[in-house]
Amino acid sequence: MAYITKRGNSFGVRYTYEDEHGKSCDKWESFPTKEEAVKRQKQIEHELATGTFLIPSTVTVAEFLMDWLPKQCSKHKWAPKTYESNLSTIQNLIIPYIGDMEMQKLRPYHMENLYTTLSKTPCGSYIEGKKQELGEKQKRRTLSGTTIHEVHRLLGTAFQYAVEWGIIIKSPVPVDSPKKSTQERTIWTVDEMRAALDSMEDPVLHLAVHLTLVGALREGEIVGLTPDDIDFDAADGIGTFHINKSMQRVRKEALNQVDDGCIIKIFPDKLERSTTSLILKSTKTASSCRTIFMTSALKEELKKWLGQMAADETKDPERYRDSGMLFRLPNGLAIEPVLIRKKFLKWQDAHPEFPRIVFHGLRHSSATYQLMISGGDVKVVQGTTGHATADMLVNTYAHIQQSSRVELGKKFEEGFYVKPGTPSPQAVPAEGEPTISVSALVELLKNADPEVKAQLRLALLT
């Protein structure tokens, strides 16, 4: 029951409820008029009778999220990087702005204000929850729409749990999410890929890039390879390498929170008091486990690389530290993803004639090229790239390159301007040009024997 008591010039509503621990609690709420007090009295009695009463709580957004995060990690068996990414979002993009607000006082307009603030916030304003001093150039680079969309997604999920846990009645997260950034990534053409590979003299970088272009690998998958993943005799001597592991450097805090079932190996720390660990883990999804067919050039390079590894071990066996990885330093220690990225950046600085791309752009370029040479066979290319769904592959990686658009324009001109009853003009090939068009060749290959398709693909990638 709820009772109304006049207290001076106001009216108080007194009621008793049980908290989340079953303890009986008394609560007073004050109102300026009796009408408001009566309205609140009826609301409380109805909610207590129907079990919809919201227990008063002063839990803040920061307190709730830091309680929710490890529970979600344990429930869904997150990988270390997933936990680390979500923790970073909470610490750097949410808590500094709405962390001190009480959950029960949060409203949709607070969320809209958060998104507006983030859209004007420079990248890196907070690191591990600590305010950073940024230079003028850094201040001009603000958070992307994709990043703000991720904040919206995380809060949407978290606040639904707050509703289930009885902390709030309704989620304050707006239905409409902030728009993602749609800027297309820069990729290389096949000529640029080939020329870039030819210009790379660093054997570590050359092999890493070669593997990426053939198999559309992720950075962690490249350095996550081990010698026993390679089979030179598989597929009737074509040779294959198997992708089932990934290497990452993660914060030790994340390792303490996640299920270690996905972790294959934790490498020894190189520095004392390191706050991060280098780990080898199973790939993030079942579809990421895949077998890649070698090209003859890649096969020879891998054989040469393994031969050099054996030679390095015999030079100084006492100091050699066999990490068990395919990519390793001359002393046997594992090469981690950041070193590959640094080598690639150094190469790019020395070769400004190539379009500037991030290392992951090589995977992007490879997937796009393979879609082109396969005649758009998404399922076949998906088997190589390891995307969880075909839609993800098409939406993320399928670029229409300039050469394809030019060809499309020519076909439009040939067909659109022909008058009824007039035979279509046939292009006469110049001397030395093939007498079959690319489109006709693609149609023939679609119905070709699978073995012929595989041989042609290997020839094009060699």
Model region roles, listed by residue range:
Residues 127-145, 149-151, 164-227, 235-238, ...:
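Basic, Lys/Arg- and aromatic-enriched nucleic-acid-binding interface segment
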Residues 3, 17, 70-164, 182, ...:
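N-terminal core-binding DNA-recognition domain of tyrosine site-specific recombinases/integrases
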Residues 232-235, 245-289, 298, 410-462:
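C-terminal secondary-structure termini that scaffold catalytic or DNA-interacting sites
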Residues 124-127, 198, 202-203, 215, ...:
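Short, basic (Lys/Arg/His-rich) helix/loop patches that form interaction surfaces
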Residues 1-32, 240, 244-274:
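Short, Arg/Lys-rich segments that mark the N-terminal edge of DNA/RNA- and chromatin-recognition modules
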Residues 229-237, 375-398, 424:
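Short, polar N-cap/turn motifs at the start of nucleic acid-interacting alpha helices
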Residues 7-113, 128, 307-322, 402, ...:
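N-terminal DNA-binding module of tyrosine recombinases/phage integrases
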Residues 179-180, 187, 245-249, 385-411, ...:
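Catalytic-site neighborhood detector that most strongly recognizes the C-terminal catalytic loop/helix
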